[in-house]
A protein has these predicted regions:
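Outer-membrane beta-barrel "beta-signal"
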Residues: 200, 204-207, 215, 233-247
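Transmembrane beta-strands of outer-membrane beta-barrel pores
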Residues: 34-40, 60-62, 69-75, 106-110, ...
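Transmembrane beta-strands of outer-membrane beta-barrel proteins
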Residues: 28-32, 54, 63-67, 87, ...
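Outer-membrane beta-barrel translocator domains and adjoining extracellular loop/strand segments
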Residues: 42-47, 76-83, 112-119, 145-151, ...
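Residues that define the transmembrane beta-barrel architecture of outer-membrane proteins
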Residues: 26, 48-52, 81-85, 98, ...
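Detector for outer-membrane/organellar transmembrane beta-barrel domains
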Residues: 118-190
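Cleavable N-terminal export/targeting peptides
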Residues: 1-27, 247
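Glycine- and aromatic-enriched membrane insertion/assembly motifs of diderm outer-membrane
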Residues: 47-102
């Protein structure tokens, strides 16, 4: 366990090394967060258990970068990994009233029994209308052994401040699909094949503190066949809580 946590720490330091050259003059934000479950695209990355995360975001001219380290607590989905570090480098520009953004994303796992790392590319278009901020996007992972093929995630999301309150409502609807080269490993990101996920959340922000509650779910069949990378017990509708402090 100590060796696994040490590797996770080294990955985190590597992530910081990518972004810290700009910290002194271009720091955007850093935060720590605790959540009842680390859920991505409706799938638990911690087998339904509490997780902790820390991240930093910086910019240098038109380029920005971030590093986020999250505990995964021996997740079967990621072959027993204790933590993951997400490294993102991207840029954005305005096309009229629409904000276009592109990102290159790497996911590095610490403590897994095998090589679980994989990469993705993302593009999105966002538009603000009054208090509503809406986004359409796609995230694609080319075919890789770690995920048993390719993976494409299409989504629509929106958030809006509730007038007269410190509350923000959030929503997202997404769909995952892709090719399969290894049916066992493909279960990591697409259990049972292509599926749809949803999220409806509410946030309260006060200074540096953010409190959030989310209702999330998927249409994944919980009774389907399981394998070493499947965690079908944590794909159903559920309510999550999270607390974040920004610096």
């Amino acid at each position: 366990m100590i060796a696994n946590l040490t590797r996770a720490g080294m990955l985190g330091v590597a992530g910081w090394a990518l972004v810290t050259p700009a910290v002194a003059q271009n720091a955007r934000s850093a935060s720590v967060e605790v959540m009842t479950d680390e859920v991505r695209r409706g799938l638990s990355w911690t087998e339904g258990r509490v997780a902790a995360a820390g991240d930093v975001r910086v910019s240098l001219g038109p380029i920005d970068a971030s590093a986020r380290a999250v505990t995964t607590r021996g997740s079967a989905r990621h072959d027993g990994a204790d933590a993951v570090v997400d490294l993102v480098v991207g840029t954005g520009w305005d096309l009229g009233a629409v904000r276009i953004r592109t990102d290159a994303i790497g996911h590095a796992f610490a403590g897994a029994r095998g090589r679980m790392d994989y990469v993705e590319g993302a593009v999105s278009a966002s538009y603000a209308y009054g208090p509503v901020y809406a986004t359409l996007g796609a995230t694609a992972a080319p075919s890789q052994r770690a995920i048993g093929g390719s993976n494409v995630y299409l989504y629509a999301s929106a958030n809006a401040g509730i007038p007269g309150t410190p509350l923000t409502i959030l929503g997202e609807l997404g769909h995952s699909t892709g090719s399969v080269s290894d049916p066992v490993r493909a279960e990591r990101l697409r259990p049972g094949g292509s599926y749809t996920n949803w999220r409806l959340g509410l946030e309260h922000r006060r200074d540096r503190l953010t409190l959030g509650v989310d209702y999330v779910g998927t249409d994944v069949d919980r009774t389907g066949d399981a394998n070493r990378f499947t965690d079908r017990g944590n794909v159903a509708d559920r309510v999550l809580g999270r607390v974040q402090i920004s610096f």
